[in-house]
Regions:
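Substrate-binding cleft of extracellular glycoside hydrolase catalytic domains
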Residues: 1-3
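Acceptor-substrate binding/catalytic loop of class I
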Residues: 25-26
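Histidine-acidic metal/acid-base catalytic patches
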Residues: 6-9, 13-15, 30-149
Length: 149
């Protein structure tokens, strides 16, 4: 946490939020992201520091996503969705084509989270407009199946 203090100060002065990104390793683990946010908020008046959580970097937390989300929720700046299969097979997958994102999205909806939700395009083999449309169509299908649940 101390290593990013200059960035914490700079973003505070600019009036910007600072989002910690779960890009794998120790720093991408939900408990560690939360610990860094707590430390910065408690010891450096950094209420603007939070978490940008990307499902495509969260394959290791499919099974405990409900607990991870609950832990991170007070600090979330944004949640980015992705199709989800075990073992990141594949890592980037359109919404509605994975085995687990429907349950994860249902968990998000039931959690009371009301912050921003994003859809990213990390597919270099597909035009961004096409990739985003596919994700929006997949999200629509997932949500339609959850209407009465």
């Amino acid at each position: 946490a101390k290593a990013i203090l200059p960035l914490v100060e700079r973003t505070r002065k600019l009036g910007c939020k600072l989002g910690l990104y779960n890009h794998g390793g120790w720093g991408g683990e939900p408990a560690n992201l939360v610990a860094v946010c707590k430390y910065l908020r408690e010891h450096h008046k950094a209420k603007h520091v939070g978490i940008v959580y990307n499902l495509h970097h969260g394959h290791g937390h499919i099974a405990d996503f409900k607990q991870s989300l609950k832990l991170m929720q007070p600090y979330l700046h944004c949640l980015n969705l992705n199709g989800m299969n075990e073992g990141a097979q594949p890592k980037i997958l359109q919404l509605g084509r994975g085995k687990h994102e429907a349950n994860m999205i249902a968990t998000i909806r039931k959690s009371g989270y009301t912050g921003p939700i994003g859809i990213l395009d990390h597919r270099s083999d597909t035009d961004t407009e096409i990739a985003l449309r596919e994700n929006l169509e997949g999200l629509k299908k997932v949500l339609e199946l959850q209407v009465d649940k």
